[in-house]
Amino acid sequence: MSDYVIECHNLETAYVGSLNRPILNEISCHIKQGEFVVLLGLNGAGKSTLLRSLVGLVPLVRGEVHINGVAMNSRILPQIRRDVGMLFQGGGLIPQLSAIENVLCGRLGTRTTWQTLFGFPKRDRLLALELLEQLGLRELAYQKTSKLSGGQQQRVAIARALIQSPQILLADEPTTGLDVIATQQVMETLAELHAQQGMTVIAVLHDLGIAARYAQRAIILDAGRIVYEGSCDNLQAQFVVNNQ
């Protein structure tokens, strides 16, 4: 059995005329269970596209993604999306809903319309409250998310991703637009999930210092290709060398 929970084999997306290349071009990489991996690169390098391809949100013209040794296809995609939580850039919360209601939205994919017609089951609500408490948001559970700070909103988004009990968490620029304190809160939350629960975390980041502090391994992309894969030591030098 493979040691890898994620395997990408020669991923390629459609050719983009404005770029004169595919967004992803022959991408191959492997990620082990329990790793904290950061994706780095300039704007347009393909970081977010690679992340989204891991849950079938990007059409590929070539290559395969394997999750837990199984090739991704339309038949098993629902199961993969239960095993892989996704934290979108900006959180993707519904501002008119409360924190707990946004967290419960993470259960929509596993509940039928009939099950949610009269509200979510009590066990779902208890789990949502438990997750918010773990993230220091219990007292804000019934507050509209539009009233929360950026860091609080991002932690609500993390709780929403966690309510499906994923094995893997993907975070697309989770600190974008946050101040220093909120950024630290969000990254500490991801680090705790990784360290205490053994969760596999893959995050797209721009700050090399934050990447070096929290991640175990870095993958640097340039023009749709992987140009570096390895330790987070001396990332500044690696980034400069590989983006010249």
UniProtKB/Swiss-Prot annotation:
Keywords: ATP-binding, Cell inner membrane, Cell membrane, Membrane, Nucleotide-binding, Phosphonate transport, Translocase, Transport. It is found in: Cell inner membrane. It is an enzyme of class 7 (translocase). Residues 6-244 form the ABC transporter domain. The keyword Transport applies. This is Phosphonates import ATP-binding protein PhnC 2. ATP binds at residues 41-48.
